[in-house]
Structures are given as C-alpha cells and as structure tokens.
C-alpha cells in the first residue's frame, strides 16, 4: 500500500469516526490545519508536498459533500495562520478578507493547494469554527469557538503526523442559580 493510499484511508476513518461523535450539521465551519511535512515523517515546515496536500484536500471535500459543512484551510505561521475559504463563506459569515496568495513556502502545501482548487478562494485572518482537525500539531485552537471539546477517534496519526480533533459547545454561564437543562421546576423565580 502506498503512503498516499494509507493517508487517504486514515483520513477517511478519522473523519467518519469524528462525525459519528460530533454530528456536524450543514453550514457549520470545520477548520483544518495540516503539516504535510509531518504527515511524511519530517519536521513541520521542511518537506511539504502538493501530492499529500491533494490527497488530504480531496478527502476533506468528500467529507464536505457528505455533511454539508464549510471548510476552512489554515495556512502556516508565515501567514499568521490565516485561512483559505470560499468567498461565499467569507461573505455569509462576514469574515474580513485579506490580500495574500498562499505559496508553499508562505502558506503551506495544504493552504496553497486549497487556494488553487476552491471555486472562488479568499484568505481571511480570523474565524470561529464549530469544529476542526489538526494534522501535525499546527495549533488550530485560535480558530475554534469557545468551548473546544476534544473528540477522541480511533485514528491517532495521519501518515506520521499526530492528529487531534475537536468540536465546540456554547459556554455554560451564570452563577449558583443557573440551569443548563430545561425542567419544569425552573418556571418560578424562587
């Protein structure tokens, strides 16, 4: 089995397992950070390839077709971890568009591949995603809504890269009288 086939299979299994637990809904935003270098067993930012990026991108697009989610592809630190999204997503969610063209050496392989393969790509600096996947310890947390909840899947690595996933939930706010599940006894002020 080739490395690319293995990466595709691991990603498919990971996304399937994640969706079983997270139940993402159509229109929710799923952020992906990925070091293709780490997938290949190399240090982040040193050996990324468009071949690995294409494999990951195509599996993520299939996941999008199955679930109706919106994808956001995190670029590398040289672009301050900005994100590639479809223009319609940026407009719908009122993300501020910035001017830059990701390239492998400043954007990373996956961000660059996404920029050249989405229908109408733009780059945005900030989003608050509903869920996400981090392949190779790229740190997607800055792009997740509060509160991030880790989701454990059976897949711990994509290729040689450590993989973590998270969904989000609304904050539980209030004090001693706060209630988090509606029950009949909560209809009075006492």
From Swiss-Prot:
InterPro entries per the UniProt record, alphabetical: Antibiotic_NAT-like, DUF436
The protein here is known as: UPF0340 protein BC_5317
Pfam family for this entry, one: DUF436
Regarding protein family, the annotation reads: Belongs to the UPF0340 family.
């Amino acid at each position: 089995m080739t490395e690319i086939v293995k990466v595709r299979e691991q990603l498919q299994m990971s996304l399937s397992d994640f969706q079983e637990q997270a139940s993402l809904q159509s229109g929710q935003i799923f952020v992906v950070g990925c070091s293709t270098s780490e997938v290949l067993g190399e240090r982040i930012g040193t050996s990324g390839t468009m071949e690995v990026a294409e494999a990951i991108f195509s599996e993520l697009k299939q996941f999008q077709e199955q679930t109706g989610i919106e994808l956001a592809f995190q670029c590398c630190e040289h672009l301050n971890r900005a994100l590639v999204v479809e223009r319609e997503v940026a407009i719908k969610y009122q993300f501020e568009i910035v001017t830059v063209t990701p390239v492998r050496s400043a954007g990373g392989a996956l961000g660059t591949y996404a920029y050249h393969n989405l229908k109408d790509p733009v780059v945005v600096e900030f989003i608050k995603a509903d869920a996400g996947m981090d392949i190779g310890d790229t740190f997607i947390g800055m792009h997740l809504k509060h509160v991030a909840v880790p989701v454990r899947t059976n897949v711990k690595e994509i290729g040689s890269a450590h993989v973590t996933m998270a969904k989000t939930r609304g904050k539980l706010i209030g004090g001693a009288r706060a209630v988090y599940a509606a029950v009949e006894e909560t209809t009075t002020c006492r």
